Amino acid sequence: AVCVSLLGAANIPPHPFNLINFMKMIRYTIPCEKTWGEYVDYGCYCGVGGSGRPIDALDRCCYVHDNCYGDAEKKHKCNPKMQSYSYKLTKRTTSAMVPQVLVHVLSVIVTARQPSASAILNTSSGTRILTPRDIADDI
């Protein structure tokens, strides 16, 4: 339930990077008791880099997250951590205008964070609701 806590740097000042914006969206939508600092050097994959076999479910989530961003970089020749998008936070829900290239990345992270959750993303081709099934279909 804390899979995106490595992004949960609530005490980091705002930056124009999508990774920071996405962290804010997740923290607002699904408040968490842990902070980014508690996971920055956890297991084999939470934090910068990663290798070996994940040590537990949380570390496995970080592994999935790392691979998801890596796949987006390879397949779409982009840097999903830096790609900007706009979002609006209201009443613990998130509405975002997300480039299509990031839909897969966001679905993996949102679903990893809260497996029963769904995310509504507004893409250039229309509104898309992402559920855990999207991960099975996209991976």
UniProtKB/Swiss-Prot annotation:
- Superkingdom to which the source organism belongs: Eukaryota
Instruction: Name the coenzymes or cofactors required.
Output: Ca(2+)
Query: What are the subcellular locations of this protein?
Result: Secreted
Q: Which cysteines are joined by disulfide bonds?
A: C46-C62
Q: Which UniProt keywords apply?
A: Calcium, Disulfide bond, Hydrolase, Lipid degradation, Lipid metabolism, Metal-binding, Neurotoxin, Presynaptic neurotoxin, Secreted, Signal, Toxin
Quote the record's cofactor note.
Binds 1 Ca(2+) ion.
Q: What is its EC number?
A: 3.1.1.4
Annotated residues for binding of Ca(2+): Y45, G47, G49, D66
Q: ATP-binding as a keyword?
A: no
Listed GO MF terms: calcium ion binding; phospholipase A2 activity; toxin activity
Main location group: secreted
Extract one GO BP annotation from the record: arachidonate secretion
Q: In which tissues is it expressed?
A: Expressed by the venom gland.
**Which InterPro entries does the record associate with it?**
PLipase_A2, PLipase_A2_dom, PLipase_A2_dom_sf, PLipase_A2_His_AS
Subunit and interaction comment: Heterodimer; disulfide-linked. The A chains have phospholipase A2 activity and the B chains show homology with the basic protease inhibitors.
Its biological purpose? Snake venom phospholipase A2 (PLA2) that shows presynaptic neurotoxicity. PLA2 catalyzes the calcium-dependent hydrolysis of the 2-acyl groups in 3-sn-phosphoglycerides.
Under which name does UniProt file this protein? Basic phospholipase A2 beta-bungarotoxin A2 chain
